[in-house]
């Protein structure tokens, strides 16, 4: 009964420190009414766990005259073996030899209880440790005292985090913060340079386009000038308008703008001409043919050259502004009719 109760208590509460002392109290209560209490206590004091088998053999080989005493010793040793062997002998007084116990007057203290180094106690101890405070305290001590970043605690929440993967380097120390700020400032300084360089390139491209556009109509202006001189030589255009326009490239360039073309067309309509510019052009050609029959070949050649040159200029203008085809034709007709 005693052994079963001890076993059940030990299994139910493995972390209880009183379970080892319960065995001794039960044995002492069992032996309290016996007359041989002093004798048993002396035997228990001289008992050694390592030499228990030898002591049992010596008790069984004793003389027959001490039969009663051998019975009592055998019964008590059996009762003693029913106890928990791994824990109870640590609290007994048998580890010290009998000679030393008899000679020494100092009280003998029991040896400290062994800690069961199994998995359950280890897990229990680890679960009771604080993770956050210990990690912060260990990290602070290690950083200031030992100049080490790695914390000493195994339960640190910041241990082994790859900060370079999550972009957390600038939060680790002030030096990295300063480096990050320096990089940002350098990027801010380089970005205006690029922004300034791009408008310069754009302006250069714009100037190149203007230069190309200014150089493009020069050939056409020379052709128009030659055509005008031919028309003046044959009396198609009055020579009063020539000195004002000859050598002035801006005038020819201004004539090609849509606003000037509109103004010229509206001015022709406001003058009250009943006939269209195309009709006036045809009439002028017919009158010239009737007035000078001798020079018919020259007039036809001039007319053909004019008709050839007019589509050339109109095509160039149509390529630029195809929607303003009617205004261009009206302006050309009005210029040649004058």
From Swiss-Prot:
Keywords: Phosphoprotein. It holds the Pfam family MBR1. InterPro entries: Mbr1. Residues 50-70, 267-306 have a biased composition (Low complexity). Residues 307-316 have a biased composition (Polar residues). Disulfide bonds: none annotated. Coiled coil: none annotated. The modification Phosphoserine is found at residue 119. Residues 50-72, 267-318 are annotated as: Disordered. It comes from the Eukaryota. Belongs to the ISF1/MBR1 family. Could influence the NAM7/UPF1 function, possibly at the level of mRNA turnover. Participates in mitochondrial biogenesis. This is Increasing suppression factor 1. It comes from Saccharomyces cerevisiae (strain YJM789) (Baker's yeast). The gene is ISF1.
């Amino acid at each position: 009964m005693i052994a079963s109760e001890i076993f059940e208590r030990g299994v139910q509460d493995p972390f209880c420190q009183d379970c080892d002392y319960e065995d001794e109290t039960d044995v002492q209560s069992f032996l309290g009414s016996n007359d041989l209490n002093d004798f048993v206590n002396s035997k228990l004091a001289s008992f050694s766990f390592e030499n228990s088998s030898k002591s049992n053999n010596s008790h069984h080989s004793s003389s027959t005259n001490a039969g009663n005493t051998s019975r009592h010793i055998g019964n008590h040793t059996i009762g003693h073996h029913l106890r928990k062997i791994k824990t109870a002998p640590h609290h007994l007084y048998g580890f010290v030899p009998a000679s030393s116990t008899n000679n020494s007057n100092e009280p003998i203290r029991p040896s400290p209880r062994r800690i069961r180094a199994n998995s359950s106690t280890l897990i229990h101890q680890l679960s009771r440790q604080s993770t956050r405070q210990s990690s912060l305290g260990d990290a602070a001590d290690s950083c200031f005292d030992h100049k080490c970043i790695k914390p000493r605690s195994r339960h640190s929440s910041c241990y082994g985090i790859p900060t370079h993967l999550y972009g957390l380097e600038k939060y680790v120390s002030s030096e990295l913060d300063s480096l990050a700020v320096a990089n940002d400032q350098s990027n801010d300084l380089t970005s205006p340079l690029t922004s300034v360089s791009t408008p310069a390139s754009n302006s250069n491209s714009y100037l190149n386009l203007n230069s190309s556009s200014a150089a493009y109509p020069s050939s056409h202006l020379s052709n128009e000038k030659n055509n005008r001189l031919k028309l003046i030589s044959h009396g198609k255009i009055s020579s009063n308008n020539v000195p004002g326009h000859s050598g002035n490239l801006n005038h020819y360039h201004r004539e090609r703008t849509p606003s000037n073309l509109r103004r010229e067309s509206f001015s022709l309509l406001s003058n009250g001409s009943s006939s269209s510019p195309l009709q006036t052009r045809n009439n002028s050609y017919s009158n010239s043919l009737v007035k000078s029959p001798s020079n018919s070949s020259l007039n036809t050649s001039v007319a053909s050259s004019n008709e050839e040159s007019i589509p050339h200029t109109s095509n160039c203008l149509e390529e630029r502004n195809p929607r303003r085809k009617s205004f261009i034709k009206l302006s050309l007709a009005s210029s040649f009719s004058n």
